[in-house]
């Protein structure tokens, strides 16, 4: 009995560390990109998945100790997918005492009508959803729209654009919406998906699966996600290094003439970012940049099968 209590204490300790890490990651992202300001009214887009639940929970937690005042309103888009449990989110949000709005739009029917059987629905579904959320943000008078994309999503987007789009383009932590009226933020930009998954398991969020994109096999994004997970297992630290690279871009050592004036280089020009290392081997650090081994990583893996709620 005493041994079981000790194990529980260790689990609770590790999970508390996990929650603090997520808080720290979100807090750093908010500060680095000035995501939240005094008086902001933030529309938290809640899909019913682990990412958006975690985002809402961490933002609520930070709200209690933040040096500025801001408010949250959770918004869910009921797309009228067959079997969608309409009661889950209202019951959850009312229990928390969170202001919320459920928007009902039959985008599922539109997507099924427009997209041939067997084709991926993500592109059209995303466009429809985005337009509805922008409209809702205006109706609610919100100043920011918060989305639940995390670090792994950002890296996946970078590789998708490189592999299929011929662009080095990721998913920005903060941007102006394509209609030019709303500021979109991604507070989980620095958070690892595996941390979010463990946190969601511990909190036992009432997860609602997506019957559209979640049920489509062989999606390009899923292939990229599997590749990154494989790299993370085989080469610890590689994911952290790649994300660090997105924050440390050197335009003079790429090939985009829009970002750097290559034509303007003449005799007498200044040496930029160390010049050319074409004749020398560049020194690469033995430990991947941005990576630190976790002393309790193995323990956290074990907790996937036996988690307790983080208070």
From Swiss-Prot:
Homodimer. It comes from the Bacteria. It catalyses: cytidine(32) in tRNA + S-sulfanyl-L-cysteinyl-[cysteine desulfurase] + AH2 + ATP = 2-thiocytidine(32) in tRNA + L-cysteinyl-[cysteine desulfurase] + A + AMP + diphosphate + H(+). Belongs to the TtcA family. Coiled coil: none annotated. GO terms for biological process: tRNA thio-modification. This is tRNA-cytidine(32) 2-sulfurtransferase. Binds 1 [4Fe-4S] cluster per subunit. The cluster is chelated by three Cys residues, the fourth Fe has a free coordination site that may bind a sulfur atom transferred from the persulfide of IscS. A motif (PP-loop motif) lies at residues 47-52. GO terms for molecular function: 4 iron, 4 sulfur cluster binding; ATP binding; magnesium ion binding; sulfurtransferase activity; tRNA binding. GO terms for cellular component: cytoplasm. The lineage of its organism: Bacteria, Pseudomonadati, Pseudomonadota, Gammaproteobacteria, Enterobacterales.
């Amino acid at each position: 009995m005493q041994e079981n209590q000790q194990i529980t204490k260790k689990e609770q300790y590790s999970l508390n560390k996990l929650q603090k890490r997520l808080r720290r990651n979100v807090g750093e992202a908010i500060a680095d990109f000035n995501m939240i300001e005094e008086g902001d009214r933030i529309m938290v887009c809640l899909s019913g998945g682990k990412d958006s639940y975690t985002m809402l929970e961490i933002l609520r937690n930070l709200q209690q100790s933040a040096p500025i005042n801001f408010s949250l309103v959770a918004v869910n888009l009921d797309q009228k997918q067959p079997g969608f449990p309409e009661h889950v989110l209202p019951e959850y949000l009312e229990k928390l005492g969170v202001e919320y709005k459920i928007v009902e739009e039959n985008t599922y029917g539109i997507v099924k009508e427009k997209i041939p059987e067997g084709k991926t629905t993500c592109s059209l579904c995303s466009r429809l959803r985005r337009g509805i959320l922008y409209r809702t943000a205006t109706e609610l008078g919100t100043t920011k729209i918060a989305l639940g994309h995390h670090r792994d999503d950002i890296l996946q987007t970078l590789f998708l654009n490189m592999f299929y789009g011929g662009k080095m383009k990721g998913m920005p932590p903060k941007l102006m919406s394509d209609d030019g009226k709303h500021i979109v933020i991604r507070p989980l930009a620095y958070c690892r998906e595996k941390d979010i998954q463990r946190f969601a398991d511990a909190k036992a969020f009432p997860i609602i699966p997506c019957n559209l994109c979640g049920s489509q096999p062989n999606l390009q994004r899923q292939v990229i996600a599997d590749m990154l997970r494989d790299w993370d297992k085989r080469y610890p630290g590689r994911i952290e290094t790649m994300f660090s690279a997105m924050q440390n871009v050197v335009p003079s050592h790429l090939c985009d003439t829009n970002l750097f004036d290559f034509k303007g280089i003449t005799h007498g020009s200044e040496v930029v970012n160390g010049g050319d290392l074409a004749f020398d081997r560049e020194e690469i650090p033995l430990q991947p940049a941005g990576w630190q081994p976790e002393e309790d990583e193995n323990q956290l893996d074990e907790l996937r099968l036996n988690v307790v709620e983080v208070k």
